[in-house]
């Protein structure tokens, strides 16, 4: 996955949603895990909505999951804000380019926890546990759970405290540098 970023992220990439967010700090949101359905998802969305209401220089793009419960909850809490765009799911090329242009990422997804640090993006993981503890240990990820107040406080901290933001965005990436396939190819050529 990390190697793929080297081929999918492009300098000349453009998209109408990114054009919309160009005058702001872009926050990418993904949230869909089954264990977060119901109140945990509501807590997550309310914390995000509160931050958007308070901090004028951010915009949120949420490529929404197909689950109808997720869609209903998102539209109810996030759907009527001019600085939040709920869009259809993105293909991998688009998604990687959105991540690359974001300021930070809020997610409950597993794969993004590996991809975003490769792009120097802080990740707030809205789950109680993660299968990627090396990212927590390295400082590229922060596990914030699904408590509304905790998400709000940690999100706001990264938006307002440059040193906290830089500590995460510049942390050593435990998931590789994106050149594993090249190294393997070089070794195989030498055999």
Question: Model-predicted segments: where are they?
Answer:
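Nucleotide-activated sugar donor-binding and catalytic core shared by glycosyltransferases
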Residues: 1-191
């Amino acid at each position: 996955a990390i190697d793929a970023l080297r081929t999918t992220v492009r300098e000349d990439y453009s998209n109408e949603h990114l054009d919309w967010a160009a005058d702001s700090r872009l926050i990418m949101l993904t949230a869909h895990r089954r264990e977060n359905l119901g109140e945990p998802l509501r807590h997550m969305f309310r914390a995000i909505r509160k931050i958007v209401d308070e901090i004028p220089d951010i915009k949120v793009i949420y490529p929404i999951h197909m689950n109808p419960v997720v869609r209903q909850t998102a539209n109810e809490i996030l759907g009527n804000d001019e600085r939040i765009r709920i869009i259809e799911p993105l293909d991998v090329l688009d998604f990687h380019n959105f991540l690359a242009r974001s300021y930070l990422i809020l997610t409950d997804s597993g794969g993004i926890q590996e991809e975003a640090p490769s792009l120097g993006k802080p990740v707030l993981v809205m789950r109680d546990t993660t299968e990627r503890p090396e990212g927590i240990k390295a400082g590229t990820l922060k596990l914030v759970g699904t408590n509304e107040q905790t998400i709000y406080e940690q999100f706001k901290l990264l938006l307002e405290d440059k040193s906290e933001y830089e500590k995460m965005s510049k942390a050593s990436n435990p998931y590789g540098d994106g050149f594993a396939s090249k190294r393997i190819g070089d070794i195989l050529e030498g055999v």
